[in-house]
Design a protein with these regions (language model features):
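Conserved glycine-bearing catalytic or ligand-binding loops at nucleotide- and phosphate-handling centers
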Residues: 69-74
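A conserved acidic, glycine/proline-rich C-terminal tail/linker
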Residues: 148-156
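Conserved catalytic micro-motifs used in adenylation/nucleotidyl-transfer and phosphoryl/amide-
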Residues: 33-59, 98-147, 160, 166-167
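Single conserved hydrophobic/aromatic residue that forms the stacking wall/gate
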Residues: 177-185
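Donor-binding/catalytic cores of nucleotide-activated saccharide
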Residues: 1-47
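Acidic-aromatic/histidine active-site loop/patch
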Residues: 80
């Protein structure tokens, strides 16, 4: 729980952070299914927070397992993580990998992905799951949350909702938007 004490104890020089409260909609309540889920690969590391359900998770999981992925949990987040990792290995940047992953997954979801230099928010093409953008005080940074009231915990001002199918990228200097590309979920 992000109490004022917990927030005060966080490193004050940190440039980025991610957190997530997950209730079991799919997968078991185990440490292996805890979020954010951190994945390491040859192009770096990323933390993934996911809200929602994939309707094609069993098929994607089977395909990933047949290609050598070893699952430690039972969540849709792990499926997304392995897809994203595979796509990152063949993509010039994380944004392209997220686009490719979104083309493969079907369902209702919102994602927040953190790398060492970027914070990425993505919303399913139909906008079934909420996701919003907030700006930190004095324009000092950005925040993403599934509920606008969560922005209050970090003192962020609500800017707008992430559009259906949209990917929003925040780095140390700016906030970038991609054009929404809706498709049927």
């Amino acid at each position: 729980v992000f109490t004022p004490r917990v927030l005060a104890d966080l490193p004050q020089d940190a440039k980025m952070a991610t957190g997530h409260v997950r209730y079991a909609t799919s997968g078991q309540r185990t440490r292996a299914n805890a979020q954010p889920m951190v994945l390491h690969h040859c192009k770096g590391a990323m933390a993934i927070c996911h809200n929602g359900n994939l309707t094609n998770a069993p098929q994607l999981r089977h395909k990933l397992e047949m290609n050598g992925s070893i699952f430690h949990g039972t969540s849709d987040t792990e499926v997304i993580g392995y897809l994203l990792t595979q796509n990152r290995l063949i993509s010039p940047d994380i944004e392209t990998a997220v686009c490719r992953t979104m083309e493969q997954i079907v369902g209702a979801y919102s994602l927040v992905i953190m790398t060492h230099t970027k914070l990425i928010a993505a919303r399913d093409p139909n906008g079934f799951r909420p996701l919003c953008i907030g700006q930190l005080p004095d324009g000092s940074g950005w925040a993403f949350a599934s509920e606008s009231c969560a922005l209050d915990a970090v003192g962020a001002r609500f800017v707008r909702d992430v559009l259906p199918g949209e990917i929003v990228v925040a780095d140390y200097t700016c906030l970038l938007y991609t054009s929404p590309s809706p498709r049927d979920a």
